[in-house]
């Protein structure tokens, strides 16, 4: 009897121990998992923020938080504005007011040479005209999209007055030779150096007939004859003296590529984007088709980089493959094919930029100015003041007069399509109506309709278009706003 009771007690103890052991096995993994999740949270507190740092929604949320901080600072010291030295920058870091950098973001035949010249004429501006031309020429053939990162890195160096990057794309005189050392590079290798006000005036050119502060176009032949080339190091030293550095180019197709530069508080970058009626752009591109053919092919490769597109190029007489046998560039009908197709890619890039800026956070929009060529030539003085105010530059009566006179020339056309001269603004705006066929207009309007709508360019023949023609100088800029 006693033995039976003892066995029963031992059985109960064994059952209890087994139940406790089973419970322990179930609880331990659960406890470990709970601690593991807590550790993950402690180790990566900003995981979601890091993952979303490049989204506009996350940037906008950060902008709202930062705006509250800036407002509290402003309330504590009403004499200081959110952009004054010592306050928070747009990306939340303390910066001082230093050199201003401006990038003029445009495409071919939009009037960007005229816009850039307004900066070139200002005595407080160091201006570079399309320096990325060197990169495109050195890396041809290649599609525009694959070059965007290299263009951005080149811009970063140039804005810091470091021109050694140009050595990578300098063309040696002999194909068998190495590219010249940066110490031996001169201003003569820069694209369109003969019209640069800094290069063609004292102190870099003591014999120049005009001082740097004198407003007026530089005669390229006169500059070439009186201003011997100087080293790029001397140009770098001159660049560092100016409070504003402006670079104009047409080869950057995606505004979003510039976001890392815009977020860099040490760079203090702003962007001026120039648009133009795509029908006028197409008309101007057709007029200068041979000069834009290589560029158009590079843009067109952005859309189609596969074997099918290479076959299209070969069918039209162009060997697109590196190392392939050189072929003649296509004549007028085939050139028109490339120009029209490239314009479709450009309009797609415009639409992408417009949607990007429309949804951008406030800090980015403060660093962005949209300008239309038509508004600039109809109201040159008003738009110039708007441009200078955005760039932090003083107004000048001589520059006002220069802008007005450049838009009141005797004619639109010129024998040299890439030569800057005074133009008739009305001719410049409406020339496409007489020179493009109905089919060409239809093609452009079909390809560019979304961008045209956002920019308030009416389709030909509708009521708004007829009103624009009747009223002539009615400014259109106010109709193109951030809303769709």
Swiss-Prot record:
The keyword Cytoplasm does not apply. 3'-phosphoadenylyl sulfate binds at residues 108-114, 276-284. One of its GO terms (cellular component) is Golgi apparatus. GO terms for molecular function: chondroitin 6-sulfotransferase activity; N-acetylglucosamine 6-O-sulfotransferase activity. The chain crosses the membrane at residues 13-33. InterPro entries: Carbohydrate_sulfotransferase, Gal/GlcNAc/GalNAc_ST, P-loop_NTPase, Sulfotransferase_dom. Residues 34-484 are lumenal. Residues 460-473 have a biased composition (Basic and acidic residues). Sulfotransferase that utilizes 3'-phospho-5'-adenylyl sulfate (PAPS) as sulfonate donor to catalyze the transfer of sulfate to position 6 of non-reducing N-acetylglucosamine (GlcNAc) residues. Preferentially acts on mannose-linked GlcNAc. Also able to catalyze the transfer of sulfate to position 6 of the N-acetylgalactosamine (GalNAc) residue of chondroitin. Also acts on core 2 mucin-type oligosaccharide and N-acetyllactosamine oligomer with a lower efficiency. Has weak or no activity toward keratan sulfate and oligosaccharides containing the Galbeta1-4GlcNAc. This is Carbohydrate sulfotransferase 7. It comes from Mus musculus (Mouse). The lineage of its organism: Eukaryota, Metazoa, Chordata, Craniata, Vertebrata. The gene is Chst7.
């Amino acid at each position: 009897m006693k033995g039976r009771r003892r066995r029963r007690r031992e059985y109960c103890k064994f059952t209890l121990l087994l139940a406790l052991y089973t419970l322990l096995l179930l609880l331990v993994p659960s406890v470990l998992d709970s601690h593991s999740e807590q550790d993950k949270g402690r180790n990566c507190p900003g995981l979601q923020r890091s993952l979303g740092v490049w989204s506009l929604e996350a940037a906008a949320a950060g902008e709202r938080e930062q705006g509250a901080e800036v407002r509290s600072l402003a309330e504590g010291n009403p004499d200081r504005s959110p952009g004054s030295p010592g306050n928070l920058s747009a990306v939340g870091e303390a910066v001082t007011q230093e050199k201003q950098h401006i990038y003029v973001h445009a495409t071919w035949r939009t009037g960007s040479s005229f816009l850039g010249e307004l900066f070139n004429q200002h005595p407080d501006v160091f201006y570079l005209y399309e320096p990325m031309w060197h990169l495109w020429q050195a890396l041809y053939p290649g599609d525009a999209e694959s070059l965007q990162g290299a263009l951005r890195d080149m811009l970063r160096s140039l804005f810091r007055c470091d021109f050694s990057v140009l050595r990578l794309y300098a063309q040696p005189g002999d194909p068998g030779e190495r590219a010249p050392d940066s110490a031996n590079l001169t201003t003569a290798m820069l694209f369109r150096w003969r019209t640069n006000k800094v290069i063609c005036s004292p102190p870099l050119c003591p014999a120049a007939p005009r001082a740097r502060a004198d407003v007026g176009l530089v005669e390229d032949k006169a500059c070439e004859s009186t201003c011997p080339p100087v080293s790029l190091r001397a140009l770098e030293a001159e660049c560092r003296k100016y409070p504003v550095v402006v670079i104009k180019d047409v080869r950057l197709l995606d505004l979003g590529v510039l976001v890392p530069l815009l977020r860099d508080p040490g760079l203090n970058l702003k962007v001026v984007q120039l648009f133009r009626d795509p029908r006028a752009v197409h008309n101007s591109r057709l007029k200068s088709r041979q000069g834009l053919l290589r560029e158009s092919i590079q843009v067109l490769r952005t859309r189609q980089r596969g074997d099918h597109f290479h076959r299209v190029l070969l069918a039209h007489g162009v060997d697109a493959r590196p190392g392939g046998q050189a072929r003649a560039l296509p004549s007028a009908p085939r050139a028109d094919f490339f120009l029209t197709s490239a314009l479709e890619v450009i309009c797609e890039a415009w639409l992408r930029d417009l949607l990007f800026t429309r949804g951008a956070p406030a800090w980015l929009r403060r660093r962005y100015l949209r300008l239309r060529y038509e508004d600039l030539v109809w109201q040159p003085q008003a738009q110039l003041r708007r441009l200078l105010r955005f760039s932090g530059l003083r107004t000048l009566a001589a520059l006002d007069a220069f802008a007005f006179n450049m838009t009141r020339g005797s004619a639109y056309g010129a024998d040299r399509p890439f030569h800057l001269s005074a133009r008739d603004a009305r001719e410049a705006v409406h020339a496409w109506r007489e020179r493009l066929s109905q089919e060409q207009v239809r093609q452009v309007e079909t390809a560019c309709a979304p961008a045209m709508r956002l920019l308030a360019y009416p389709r030909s023949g509708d009521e708004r278009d007829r009103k624009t023609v009747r009223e002539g100088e009615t400014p259109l800029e106010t109709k193109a706003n951030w809303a769709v």
